[in-house]
A protein has these predicted regions:
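C-terminal partner/receptor-binding element of secreted or periplasmic proteins
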Residues: 124-161
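Extracellular secreted precursors and ectodomains with disulfide-bonded cysteine-rich loops/domains
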Residues: 10, 80, 140-141
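Predominantly extracellular/secreted and cell-surface proteins with exposed
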Residues: 36-115
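Glycine-anchored, exposed beta-strand/edge motif detector
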Residues: 100-105, 110, 122-128, 137-139
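Sec-dependent N-terminal signal peptides
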Residues: 1-7
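C-terminal region of N-terminal signal peptides and the immediate post-cleavage residues
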Residues: 7-26
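A domain-level signal for the mature, folded cores of soluble proteins
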Residues: 22-39
Length: 161
């Protein structure tokens, strides 16, 4: 399952949206930085497709976390519930609709919130993310997260309108 999901995310190159108005589309891989302790160095693949303004936004997100050996560590899919776009930065919040975590069998994060922010910097995109589970703080509707990690592979396209 992991390889096909990852291939689909990387193939998504951030092409233009068919809808008008604010949007973010694309996919890419980040490498978890040192602040993630034992998970540092793991690749995480993000796909984000959203359009609209505020809580009238619609879209989907897909996150795949692989371990350092390339095995599937976690996978989450959900719906975007809010989108804010300012210049080349898009902040989306969403709700997890399906998830699987290797180290937490039986735990349910379905219904919990996610915040993802993308800075579209051409070939040097950056990403920030926060997941509302495993002791992390609650995510407010339409929250944003400072992009803190470079996108190593892939591309996101942010459109302000």
């Amino acid at each position: 399952m992991g390889a096909s999901v990852v291939a689909g995310i990387i193939a998504c190159s951030g092409g233009a949206s068919a809808s008008s108005g604010p949007s973010v589309h694309g996919g890419g891989m980040v490498t978890l930085p040192a602040q993630f302790d034992d998970l540092a160095g793991d690749p995480v693949y993000f796909q984000l497709q959203a359009h609209g303004v505020g809580e009238a936004a619609a879209g989907r997100f897909n996150v795949v976390h692989l371990d350092d050996a390339g095995g599937l560590y976690a996978h989450a899919v959900g719906d975007v519930t809010c989108l804010s776009v300012v210049g080349g930065v898009a902040s989306a919040t969403g709700i997890i609709r399906h998830a699987w975590f290797r180290d937490f069998p039986g735990s349910s994060v379905v219904g919990m919130a996610v915040a993802i922010t993308v800075a579209d910097n051409g070939s040097e995109d950056a990403l920030g993310f926060h997941f509302e589970f495993f002791g992390e703080p609650t995510i407010a509707p339409c929250a944003d997260v400072t992009p803190f990690v470079a996108v190593d592979r892939g591309n996101f396209a942010v459109r302000s309108g």
